[in-house]
């Protein structure tokens, strides 16, 4: 049986990792050891931030809804409660988009929700 040396596989693995580090500054894009560490940190950050992005956008939507709700004489908390009682099923993303792009429609939704609470 022929002896198998691992040079080709090592070269392939190193090239693959250096390709991932392309665009990094200095040794991070040229030296395998430094590039490996940089890529591992980058992948860890990307994984974490894909989850964080969802939280960040939800917070942004809530802030926008709260600001628009206060212009209509209520708060975010009261508005969400009123929407639930009025059985108006609209998610925070759409509500925030309405608040920014179509304030009149947002105001009508707020009025409908408040009417359902008082009735």
Curated annotation (Swiss-Prot):
Q: Name one GO cellular component term.
A: ribosome
Q: Could you list the residue ranges forming a coiled coil in this record?
A: none
- PROSITE patterns linked: RIBOSOMAL_L20
User: What Pfam families does its record include?
Assistant: Ribosomal_L20 (PF00453)
Keywords, in A-Z order: Ribonucleoprotein, Ribosomal protein, RNA-binding, rRNA-binding
- What does the record give under GO molecular function? rRNA binding; structural constituent of ribosome
Q: Which SUPFAM superfamilies match?
A: Ribosomal protein L20
Could you provide one GO biological process annotation from this protein's UniProt record? translation
- Family, as annotated: Belongs to the bacterial ribosomal protein bL20 family.
UniProt-listed NCBIfam families:
rplT_bact
Among PANTHER family, the record links this protein to: 39S RIBOSOMAL PROTEIN L20
Known function: Binds directly to 23S ribosomal RNA and is necessary for the in vitro assembly process of the 50S ribosomal subunit. It is not involved in the protein synthesizing functions of that subunit.
Task: Quote the protein name from its UniProt record.
Answer: Large ribosomal subunit protein bL20
Gene source species: Chloroflexus aggregans (strain MD-66 / DSM 9485)
**What is the organism lineage in this UniProt record?**
Bacteria, Bacillati, Chloroflexota, Chloroflexia, Chloroflexales
